[in-house]
Design a protein with these regions (language model features):
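Extreme N-terminal cap/leader segments of soluble proteins
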Residues: 1-65, 84, 93, 111
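General structural feature for long, well-ordered alpha-helical segments within catalytic domains
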Residues: 9-13, 34, 69, 73, ...
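Short beta-strand
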Residues: 28-31, 77, 128-129
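Short, flexible micro-motifs
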Residues: 34-36, 73, 97, 129-130
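Glycine-rich anion-binding loops of enzyme active sites
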Residues: 43, 53, 89-146
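Short secondary-structure transition/capping motifs
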Residues: 62, 66-70, 98, 102
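Small-aliphatic-rich amphipathic alpha-helix that forms the alpha element of a beta-alpha
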Residues: 66-90, 111-119
């Protein structure tokens, strides 16, 4: 039987959903898995953007597949970086998950996130997870350079 995130434990849960993410950018010195990411600065300007997606407001899971939602949650941030003529480099993800979601479901969400990261050569360098009384909330911060 599939476990939910509270049964697995925070650190095991994070390791499970992010195990296949790889660092692609040389500026990303330390990625997900520690207290903080380490990103090397350059002479370029850093762009920072954040978008929050809340179930029932920004998406409806009755017709939005979780993999598509994961992809979309990354792309809405990257579009802000591209709008400033920048090159996206890293993302940080925060998710609030209710107990109705099993780990398998969240892994499906992260498949979409991973697909977007691979396509646009973005590094997932950190994040946070917490429980939610109802629904799913996704918060992504994207960093880029211009």
């Amino acid at each position: 039987m599939a476990k939910n995130n509270s049964e697995l434990g925070e650190f095991s849960f994070i390791e499970k959903i992010t195990e296949n993410f790889e660092i692609k950018n040389s500026e990303s010195l330390l990625g997900i898995g520690d207290d903080s990411a380490i990103i090397e600065s350059s002479k370029l300007h850093t762009l920072v953007t954040k978008d929050l997606l809340v179930e029932g407001i920004h998406f409806d899971l009755s017709y939005t597949p979780l993999m598509h939602l994961g992809y979309k949650s990354v792309i809405v941030n990257l579009s802000d970086i591209y709008a400033m003529n920048g090159i996206p480099k890293q993302i940080v993800i925060g998710i609030a998950i209710s107990n109705r979601f099993k780990v398998d479901s969240i892994q499906e969400l992260y498949k979409g996130i991973k697909l977007a990261c691979e396509k646009y050569k973005i590094d997932l360098v950190g994040g946070d997870t917490t429980t939610s009384q109802s629904g799913l909330t996704i918060s992504i911060t994207a960093l880029g350079q211009v």
